[in-house]
A protein has these predicted regions:
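Transmembrane alpha-helical segments and their short flanking loops
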Residues: 2-18, 53, 57-71, 275-284, ...
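Short, membrane-interfacial amphipathic segments enriched in basic
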Residues: 1-21, 63, 168-177, 212-217, ...
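Early transmembrane hairpin of solute transport permeases
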Residues: 20-173, 347
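Helix-loop-helix hairpins and the membrane-proximal interhelical loops
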Residues: 22, 30, 36, 46-75, ...
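Membrane-interfacial segments
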Residues: 47, 51-56, 97-105, 166-175, ...
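Alpha-helical membrane segments and immediately flanking helix-loop junctions
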Residues: 87-93, 97, 114, 280-351, ...
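Alpha-helical transmembrane segments in multi-pass membrane proteins
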Residues: 40, 86, 90, 94, ...
Length: 445
């Protein structure tokens, strides 16, 4: 018992410190804001390929062939949303970190974007008809989409931290008379810190390239982002991430929030790559994405508690457990399961904690191998996490019935895993009540 309490205290202390770390706060808030943009782009991909595509969509039917002429609309939406996610992330992280640092304007976000572009190569060598041509003043797609996400986060944080430090130095502020409007005065006040920050970041990028022969993008992508992508795209890697999240849930800490700074950039980046490939008719590369997590590892909410709710209705006669299951079923359909986690409870419950941790690891493995074997389609559409089961499987895979069947299998497996533990938990409650009743009877005798 002492070890359990010590573990809970240690994890709780770590979670509190982790969530209060300002860089983590800024990154989490930024990706929450970005989510609608990703979903808009996702549904444009879905409509483009399932409705407007002249080969595979509804437009392939003669009567609906006119729909193909509308495809440029969805292509434009796709380009504007998915191809500039990194720019949006840099801008939002700059704003959020600036706000945390006490700067209430939007300028830190704009400065972060400027600094990011300062370290990004804008000259490209292209082979055209056997001859090498140099093209200047272009921003390649790999620098604006999720492939440069980690570089973007690093530059946004670095530039805003430098700017904040300089902005707090009174000697660097250009002070205007009191008659000057506050917004104009603030602009002049930020001028010298902004010049120094931009120059410092641009110089850093230039010196790094001169010394190493590599751009910052190449270094960060090869050393940090690519290895992390390989880990998370592996089955052991994603299962480990899920295990950590579930462990935090069990001690009463929001597990998904704890892993969000790692999970969101990598899994949202993976689904963005898939959506772009799907839109262009190329092979979809990634199995493990944000929809994969939702469709196979979080059905009904963390721990696949939809299986627990059904198992309770099947395996126990305990009225209070059934009432909690009934009340939790409505939110559970939309993958909201705090009522069952804290009401059953699963939190700090050693019996129900075991299947709560194990079940998503099993179903994640099922989903992974079903996709590897080609039975279930890969996710190519980002759908809201509150989308009900079966619907989210069908939508996220652009109509793969194999994915729907696999998700049904995962639900069935989750019920089978939870059933024996529900029976044990029910018996424990009954034994505790009988023991309490016997003690009460002995007192009254």
């Amino acid at each position: 018992m002492a070890f359990q309490e010590k573990l809970i205290d240690s994890l709780g202390s770590f979670a509190t410190k982790f969530n209060s770390y300002r860089y983590i706060m800024a990154i989490k808030a930024s990706f929450i804001t970005l989510m609608p943009v990703i979903i808009v782009g996702a549904f444009s991909v879905l409509i483009s390929n399932m409705v407007l595509d002249p080969k595979n969509g509804l437009a392939s039917f003669q009567a609906l062939s006119f729909l193909a002429a509308l495809k440029p609309i969805t292509s434009a939406i796709n380009y504007a949303t998915l191809n500039f996610l990194n720019i949006g992330a840099v801008f939002l992280i700059g704003i959020e970190l600036g706000r945390i640092n006490g700067i209430k304007t939007l300028f830190p976000g704009l400065l972060a974007v400027i600094c990011f572009i300062c370290v990004t190569p804008t000259t490209v060598e292209m082979l055209v008809e056997g001859e090498m041509h140099v093209v200047k003043d272009v921003l390649l797609r790999q620098f604006s989409d999720t492939r440069s996400l980690f570089l973007g986060m690093f530059i946004a944080i670095l530039s805003v931290e430098i700017y904040t430090w300089l902005e707090h130095r009174d000697g660097l502020k250009i002070k205007m008379p009191d008659t000057v409007p506050p917004n104009v005065s603030a602009s002049f006040s930020a001028l010298i810190p902004a010049i120094i920050t931009t120059t410092a970041i641009a110089t850093f990028g230039f010196v790094f390239h001169q010394v190493t022969g590599m751009y910052l993008y190449d270094a960060v992508y090869q050393v940090v982002q690519q290895p992390l992508e390989r880990v998370v795209q592996s089955l052991p890697g994603i299962l480990l991430l899920m295990f950590v999240a579930q462990l935090f849930w069990v001690i009463g800490i929001h597990g998904n929030q704890m892993i969000k700074p790692i999970r969101e950039p990598l899994l949202l980046g993976a689904i963005t790559v898939n959506m772009s490939a799907f839109e262009q008719g190329k092979e979809v590369p990634n199995i493990i994405t944000m929809p994969f997590w939702d469709v196979y590892m979080s059905i009904g909410g963390s721990g696949l508690t939809i299986g627990l709710l059904i198992a309770v209705m099947i395996a126990t006669k305990r009225k209070e457990m059934k009432e909690i299951a009934k009340l939790s079923f409505g939110p559970g359909i939309f993958n909201i399961n705090e009522p069952v986690i804290f009401g059953m409870p699963i939190m700090l419950n050693p019996i129900l904690a075991v299947p709560f941790i194990i079940t998503p690891l099993v179903t994640g493995s099922i989903g992974y191998f079903a996709t590897v074997m080609g039975f279930a389609g890969k996710a190519v559409v980002m759908v809201p996490w509150t989308t009900p089961p079966l619907i989210n499987a069908w939508l996220s895979t652009a109509g793969s019935m194999g994915a729907v069947v696999t998700q049904l299998l995962c639900i069935l497996v989750s019920i089978l895993i939870y059933l024996p533990f529900v029976k044990i938990a029910s018996r424990r409650v009954e034994q505790a009540q009988l023991q309490a009743a016997s003690v009460e009877t002995a007192k009254n005798a």
